[in-house]
Amino acid sequence: MGRTIRRRRSNSSLSEAISVSLGINQDSSVNKMHRASVSAMSPPLCRSYMSGFFTGGNSPMINNLSDSKLPISNKQHPKVIHGSENLHRQTAQLSNEFCSSSVEENSPTIKDYMDIIGNGDRKDDQSMRTIEENIDEEYSDEYSRLLLSPASSNVDDDRNRGLQNSSLPELEDGYAGGYQSLRPSHNLRFRPRNLWHMCTSFPSKFAHYLPAAVLGLLLNILDALSYGMIIFPITEPVFSHLGPTGISMFYISTIISQAVYSGGWSSFPSGIGSEMIEITPFYHTMALAIKEALAGNDDEIITTTIFCYVISSMLTGVVFYALGKLRLGKIVGFFPRHILIGCIGGVGYFLIITGIEVTTRVAKFEYSWPFFSGLFTDYDTLAKWLLPVLLTVVLIGTQRYFKNSLVLPSFYILTLVLFHFIVAIIPTLSLDALRQAGWIFPIANSDSKWYDHYRLFNVHKVHWSLVLQQIPTMMALTFFGILHVPINVPALAMSLQMDKYDVDRELIAHGYSNFFSGLLGSVQNYLVYTNSVLFIRAGADSPFAGFLLIALTICIMIIGPVIISFIPICIVGSLIFLLGYELLVEALVDTWNKLNRFEYLTVVIIVFTMGIFDFVLGIIVGILIACFSFLVDSTKLQTINGEYNGNVARSTVYRDYVQTKFLDGIGEQIYVLKLQNLLFFGTIISIEEKIERLLQISNKDATKRRIKYLILDFKNINADNIDYSAAEGFNRIKRFTETKRIKLIISSIKERDRIYNAFNNVGLLNDVELFADLNSALEWCENEFLFQYKQLRKKAKERLEEGKQNNVVSAVIAATKNKKIDTIGNGLNRGSNGDTARNLMSLPTNTPRNYQILSVAQNVFVNDEQAVKNFKKEYKDDEPVLPILLFALKQYRPDIISEVQKVREKEIKFWAQLCPYFTRRRLASQSHLLHADNIFFLVETGMLKATYELPQGTLYEIFSNGTCFGKIIAPGNAMPREQKLTIETETDSVLWVIDSSSLNKLKEDNLALYVEVALMVMCIKDTRFKELLGYTLVSA
């Protein structure tokens, strides 16, 4: 099965693009092997009377554009998306300065570095480092399978050639009812091995398939009499003599389609092809329009009309063939089925009206009281339409009682015999008298032949201007015709238990049959579901049966015109009424409680619009209703796939204890909205309303969300396209967030995306941060908060130094006055005056967000960071790795900073035993750390990236300084090859490492410590696993 790899939001075929815009193809992170399949258990739509059925480093405090200024696009200097490598360097520098115990006066601040990074991101793309992207790849589904298809329409060329050059289909028992079904083998064309075999096998095959062929012939005859007869509007005087011509054109179309299907161009060599009944209303529309334009010129009317018929057939064939060759078989399946059902009901309504016109011989059905009263008060007229109605009622009742495919042909054969028997035994009745009274079709001319209609093809009498005027009707006819193949073909395959078929191949076959039918002066045709099922179940399991049916049909066609003069009009009327009844039941009765109210109302509107006004108008109304329905339904799409604050949605950066504590406290000021589905004028309103409700910030109401960074993630947007209204909607969202002093961030967007270009064109990207993925956006937001905390800490240190100087001056003055003072600074250094320490930090604006940041920063500074600095000073003369080790283990071993001295000293003494086993390493940027699955290390400075390569995809995390990580695999155990861990330095780094040999030595020297290290590694990995799993679930 020909699968093709495609990149997300890449250019694809037309049918795939539509599949994406409707949501059929989903993201590969959800399901790479997803195949859209639609059930085919509902009945086919066809005649059914036979069976009754980012810029970098900028702090968020940026001067906003005034509301009076219109946003303008910046095509010369487009907004640059933040690069992941620059972002990781920023995080590394921030962590290095963050963990230092003091800030030197002349040292560059982290903000200077962030500005450098930002300026670097603004440079031209050629000077930037290549942005490392993770592009989702997914298999494009081989085929949407439309209704039930288990096989792809996008099969490869070799398979196509295999299907085109196959042998006789194999026979396989069906699952129900003992029926036999067809399963195509290697060759579908009928090719006898040799002439001798053909000659000897012909008699036996003829006898074997003759009953099935006779049944198929009866079906063709009934179809010819029911709607072949009314190809032309025979109730109009100018067309009244063209009933036999319509039948001949019907037979020609049937023979050509049967030859194409049985000749090996179709997967159903025993299927029955026949004229499309749905074309009749369109033909009548064209014929009547031409008659009105050429009143009084009968020959020119007929010639122009018949040319319109054959041109429409050729046009239909070309469209069928093009759809099949372009592999667009599934595209027609996107048309709403209830619209098609309404069109089918419209055909049924038309047939009921036509049945009344044919039986009563009225020129045109009128919607007036005199006309309706005449149908009941004129006894002759009443009898002519009531009798076929009664025949139809009797037949419907008989079919419900007897479930046999022969009921229909047997009923009408018996009716025909009974009619002539009654005429024979009643002396006052005669065929001639009945013909004059309108009960039997008039006698055809004695020299009338089946090919007489070819005499009507006179190019000199064609009014080509009128032909051009009928092109809209021809297009509507073609559009309506192509909707049946993707419905009837899967339905027939299901009935025959076929597992392998190709809708595109069937479209090509229909293209041949319709084009050649028009070329030979006939009308449209298609594969008839009901007749094909009856034909195959009667024993037609070989193309031979199809060719035998062709021969019998040719015989009847040659005799044709003579037979018509002996057929009672009531039988033809009954057939028309039956077909109209079946289609109306299928449209209006069978869909009750299956369609919702809006869909059912749509069906009713289409039915009566087609029946009362015009078929083309009905299709236009149906398409408009379908578009309106799609618009209404699209506005109801759930555009928010998920919403998370920063406490839940965290980046995969592994940060030290102090940074983690601070981010835990202010995480709710980061808010993520994951968008999904389509972005257009119908869905942007719901997004605006959601954000407006979300950003209702109040100084008094603590229940309102305190959001500083709003991230809109575009990962699950189904189509890389957005209209102007939606782009302007995001501009309104941006202006609204600016009034609330909230930074708008967009993630999962790339510079090559059309959405990026649309946003740039409307000026949305000014003062908006852009990131290629959600992880980078979260990392940037966390860095901004950590920078703000560092600034607060720097101010606290400056105030602390000022306090110490003031205390010295106060001490000198007090000494001269013999007074004693208690310095505040000593109290602070001992951490005994927490309240004063808190007062060292402040923010200029007292808002709920700033108050929260200040409160959390004060708590972290007093309770955690001061404690960490104290033990760093206490153990600075010991092993240089010890303070780093204790700082890294603090979040996993709280006893390291326990207030109980004995507990703290015992814990520190225990872990101090590990220091001799560490080795200090300096690694340049982009260096690999070899671990052999046994390692424990501390990050003193720098930044590392750990990449996990799994069968399901690749995931990475960043290790900042002040953290520890390890991996220990017991001897004899091995990790699966497909689960690979790669550790690489993102910046120049300094590590303290216990490698595999040192771990083995530790195990021999101090088993208890080795076990604790192993348990520590397990604890670290468990914590990191939960963090990574959480991010994976959030970003899905």
From Swiss-Prot:
MF annotations from Gene Ontology: arginine binding
Topology versus the membrane: Multi-pass membrane protein
Pfam family of the protein (one): STAS
Positions carrying Phosphothreonine: 130, 847
Topology Cytoplasmic: residue spans: 235-236, 291-300, 360-375, 427-473, 537-546, 590-604, 686-1036
Phosphoserine modification, residue list: 42, 127, 140, 144, 149, 152-153, 842
Lineage: superkingdom: Eukaryota
PROSITE patterns: STAS
An individual GO BP term: basic amino acid transmembrane import into vacuole
Keyword annotations of the record: Amino-acid transport, Membrane, Phosphoprotein, Transmembrane, Transmembrane helix, Transport, Vacuole
Keyword Transmembrane among UniProt keywords: yes
Disruption phenotype: Decreases cellular arginine uptake. Sensitive to canavanine; the effect is suppressed by simultaneous knockout of YPQ2.
Main function: Amino acid transporter involved in vacuolar uptake of basic amino acids for storage during nitrogen replete condititions. May function as an amino acid/proton antiporter.
Protein name: Vacuolar basic amino acid transporter VSB1
Gene, per the UniProt record: VSB1
